[in-house]
């Protein structure tokens, strides 16, 4: 009897993590979700994730309170008093960067995977369109994977399906699974908490919209580019 393949998806209810979840549901026998409540500015994403998780068929969906991150990490995403800016800070990072967020999220997802006996943790981080976040880079992910495997004496792979895709190719991936409309209309990527097309002005909305326009205008080429990356 073959082993049941299990994965834990770090799931925020946004475009990237929803696309990763949909792909995982087509690739694994059991898919579990983990969502984090850290007092984020766009807190509506938690309910969006809960609703989408139920609709798409997660085997289990754990929503964790990690509000201590909000106390420690000062960012436009953790403080309503700080306006989201399209300009970089003096340190070269966006003011939406939450220090340690993916370190914490991947650690907790790794622990959850350990308890479930899952061999994969899936996250939608991306180095191509990473918005300047250092904890979305491939080197960081590989280092985290090594640390978790050594610390728990168990092999668990951190899978990053979007790592080398641009935003247009991420839209193409959703379309490949016949889920472009769902991702476009029902996910929450906007830093100002507006579902679907969002506010249209925050960095997350601008990146999402430019990718969708690129895909809509160059569908065949983007699909071809996606296919070449997926088969490397």
From Swiss-Prot:
Catalyzes the ATP-dependent conversion of 7-carboxy-7-deazaguanine (CDG) to 7-cyano-7-deazaguanine (preQ(0)). SUPFAM superfamilies: Adenine nucleotide alpha hydrolases-like (SSF52402). Binds 1 zinc ion per subunit. ATP binds at residues 11-21. The keyword Ligase applies. It holds the Pfam family QueC. It comes from the Bacteria. The keyword Isomerase does not apply. GO terms for biological process: queuosine biosynthetic process. This is 7-cyano-7-deazaguanine synthase. Keywords: ATP-binding, Ligase, Metal-binding, Nucleotide-binding, Queuosine biosynthesis, Zinc. Gene3D superfamilies: HUPs. Belongs to the QueC family. It catalyses: 7-carboxy-7-deazaguanine + NH4(+) + ATP = 7-cyano-7-deazaguanine + ADP + phosphate + H2O + H(+). Pathway: Purine metabolism; 7-cyano-7-deazaguanine biosynthesis. InterPro entries: QueC, Rossmann-like_a/b/a_fold. GO terms for molecular function: ATP binding; ligase activity, forming carbon-nitrogen bonds; zinc ion binding. Zn(2+) binds at residues 190, 199, 202, 205. It is an enzyme of class 6 (ligase). Disulfide bonds: none annotated. Coiled coil: none annotated.
């Amino acid at each position: 009897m073959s082993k049941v393949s299990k994965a834990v998806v770090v799931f925020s209810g946004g475009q990237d993590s929803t696309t990763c979840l949909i792909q995982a549901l087509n690739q694994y026998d059991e898919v579990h979700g983990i969502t984090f409540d850290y007092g984020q500015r766009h807190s509506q994403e938690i309910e969006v994730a809960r609703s989408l998780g139920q609709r798409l068929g997660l085997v289990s969906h754990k929503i964790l309170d990690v509000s201590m991150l909000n106390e420690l990490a000062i960012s436009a995403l953790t403080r309503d008093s700080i306006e989201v800016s399209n300009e970089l800070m003096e340190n070269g990072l966006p003011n939406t960067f939450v220090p340690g967020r993916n370190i914490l999220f991947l650690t907790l997802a790794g622990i959850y995977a350990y308890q479930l006996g899952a061999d994969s943790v899936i996250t939608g981080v991306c180095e191509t369109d990473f918005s300047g976040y250092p904890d979305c880079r491939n080197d960081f992910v590989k280092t985290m994977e090594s640390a978790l495997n050594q610390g728990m004496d168990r092999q668990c792979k951190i899978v990053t399906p979007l790592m080398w895709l641009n935003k247009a190719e991420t839209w193409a991936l959703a379309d490949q699974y016949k889920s472009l409309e769902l991702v476009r209309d029902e996910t929450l990527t906007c830093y100002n908490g507006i579902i679907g097309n969002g506010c249209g002005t925050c960095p997350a909305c601008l990146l999402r919209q430019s990718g969708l326009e690129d895909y809509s205008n160059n569908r065949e080429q983007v699909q071809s580019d996606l296919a070449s990356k997926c088969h490397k």
